[in-house]
Amino acid sequence: MADPTIDKPSNITPLRDNRLSTAGRPAKPAPAFIFGHDDDSGPELEILGAGTKAASQIAAPQGVDLASKKKIIFWIGRGKTGKTTGIRWSAEAAILDGTTLLMADMDPTNDTFSKYIDNVARPPQASDPVLSLKWLDKLLQHALRHGVSLLVDLGGGDTTLRRLVTELPDLVAMIEAQGFAIVLFYTVGPQEEDLSPLATMEGLGFRPTATAIVLNEAMAEIGDPPENAFARTLRHSAFLAAVERGAVPIWMPRLLPAQQVEIRRLKFHDAAAGEIGQGKTPLGPFDRSRVLNWLQAMDANFAGVKTWMP
């Protein structure tokens, strides 16, 4: 879009040459205009658990080492918080590494994960809470019995895991006794309500050591620094309590051509490689580069919890 034209009011005198005033003295230069600078020029608010200033400056946090463990991994988040993007990235990386794992899509309202990745199981009636609970129960036992890691997509409004935890308050200890570890990735945007799945599960006492809070930069307005967009989230009591007990905050970078990748139904690495998918043309060279840079940024941001992956 072209820059808007601003008409000069007729009663405004044109600016004089700044080099000399009428008296021959140098004129005082006008204050420089920086868009957004005057909106919030105060000092940064000190927030416990948010000791860095911007996503690009945050060092990858180090999580507990789970390299020797099989894992039960849940990605949990409300709609439009980047949950499916995150779990797709995780699944693709595991598949490229040749990792044997089980995958399940239990989001009752969004089955995108199972549409992008092959061999993802899904309950016959994902919207039926009773059948979904039985299905998850049997799926977990199947993974434990066969010693295979499991990757599960749970919707933010899904109550299946919550009801299972209510029935089995010792679920974490029971799974750990089988030589497995439970890993939770909560995806959140700038809305405080996005913390509700985290607050609910933490309130039930479901607090695995390997818990990450994934702050999705794509949910912030373009041009708004992430530390500003997520300020209320970063100082919310639910976030601070989870971080205080050991949860790891991780920034998920924005993928600018996400829609173009989705239109073509492409895996991220295929998009970067110039595959066509269900589209008529591949991504252009700029967007392919953006996807590749995003993949590299994801690897860097999640490096501290690399052993939490399948």
Question: What is each stretch, according to the model?
Answer:
Residues G79:
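The conserved Walker
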Residues D97-T112:
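Short beta-strand-centered segment that lines the nucleotide-binding/catalytic pocket of NTP-utilizing
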Residues T109-Q125:
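P-loop NTPase switch/communication element
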Residues Q125, V148-V165:
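Switch II (G3) loop of P-loop NTPases
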